[in-house]
Amino acid sequence: MSENPEPSKGSTPNVEGAEKVNKPPVKKGWSNPALRMMGIPKISLPSRNWMIFWTLLASVGGGVAYDRYQQKQIRKKWMEKFEPLGEEAYRTDRIPRKLSVFIAPPPNDYLDSSMVYFRKYVKPLLNASAIDFDVFTENRQGDIRAAVAERIRELRIETNENAKKAQEEAKQEQYDASWTKFFKKDVPNFFTLKFQSNSKEDEALVSSNDLYSPKDVLGLYYLKEPIDAKRDDELNPMEAGGVICIGRGAYKEYMTGVHEGLLGPLEAPEEVRTITEVDPQVTENEPETAHNDNESKAVVELPVLPTDDLPADSVDKQDAVPETPSETAENTPNAEEGDNEKPVPKPFITPDEYPNATYAPEFQNVSLIMNKKNVPVIFEQPVYVFPLPIVSGFLNTHRKLYRFFTKRNVADDYGCRTSVVVQNVSRPFVYKDQFMAKEEELEWPKKWVATGKEKNSEWVQELVTDDRVTTRMKVFDVSLAAKSTDKPIDKPTNE
């Protein structure tokens, strides 16, 4: 036997089998000869991780896209309903109805959060219905309240001055018709003029060119009389204007400002004057709204109210902001000017003093208070508030996500509420109306509310009303307008 026998066939290593074992399995898929000729590989499902990624991305993207599409459709539905009002032809001597819109930032948030809801869900419908409006915003608590109260006080002062002038004119007319004036002034003046020695001078001749110019008589330069344009509010004072408050906070400040203007004194009390003049830095440095550090440095934009109800002298005192037919022009001051901004005036009267306060004597015997343009003043116009569906906090993440994907519900709800304002369906103010948008307070941050109570913030206090003031007020009635939601709006025929 040889020392090195040849290995048997059964003991030879199976190289081909080992290669098959180490080779990865062929991925399952579907292939087509035509696709294979074009260089397209086999069509197969992606891996598990890619499946999770694409499923999540498609779900989120599809949900957002569907919600935005529905918002556009809802907005289009309401705009088509108001289209007959927008197609109405206006002559040069006619101006559409005007609303006043007050917007305040949500608690512990920026003003832009509130402006988004107005610009997306309210403003397009007002523009479609050809309704003019003025927008007033604030970044500090108390700006709206102070502006509304100051406007009413100036209106009361103007009424007092007009009453005094009327009394003086009546006394002068009575004196002119009396015998006292006849014997004291008329008779002496008659003899003085009769025996006056000074002779009259000849009337000086004046050239015709000094009296008038050729363009005063030529048709090319003929100037027509100025057009006296009138608003629709003047035609029917009972359905004039309206007030919209975006947010419960803006509504509270508006109502408090109306009460302060009608029940409070015309001049600041000694306590308020002392706080404002002696120690203004304390009021400036103490933020009434519990914003964070970054928000406390935000630029302040004071509301500028319309001057229709104010005397001519007080118009120059205000910082006039140019208004477009749809929205206020944003004139934002510099950051340095925001730091030097005057503090918000303290209220002239507190809610505890309402029962003992005297109602404005200037308006006690007046059934409907009108301004110079024969339009009811702001607190005689209907008011309504739009609640802000904004939640904050980590524990409310699930609610944030749900509302983020269902903004179409907010668009439809705001559209229904805006139809109330457009159709001008109003009713007298009742006790329950002071709780409008009360549900919004349940979603305010608890820490912010606690801080506001410590600093005696206006927003966290209960809204107190007085019957002497609310009997003059009206609100837009949602219940009546909801019944006529499906009915088309007819084109008005105002001549």
Curated annotation (Swiss-Prot):
Its main location: mitochondrion. GO terms for biological process: protein transport. Residues 1-14, 325-334 have a biased composition (Polar residues). It is found in: Mitochondrion inner membrane. The keyword Phosphoprotein does not apply. Keywords: Membrane, Mitochondrion, Mitochondrion inner membrane, Protein transport, Translocation, Transmembrane, Transmembrane helix, Transport. It is a single-pass membrane protein. GO terms for cellular component: mitochondrial inner membrane. Residues 1-49 are mitochondrial matrix. Essential component of the TIM22 complex, a complex that mediates the import and insertion of multi-pass transmembrane proteins into the mitochondrial inner membrane. The TIM22 complex forms a twin-pore translocase that uses the membrane potential as external driving force. This is Mitochondrial import inner membrane translocase subunit TIM54. It comes from Debaryomyces hansenii (strain ATCC 36239 / CBS 767 / BCRC 21394 / JCM 1990 / NBRC 0083 / IGC 2968) (Yeast). The lineage of its organism: Eukaryota, Fungi, Dikarya, Ascomycota, Saccharomycotina.
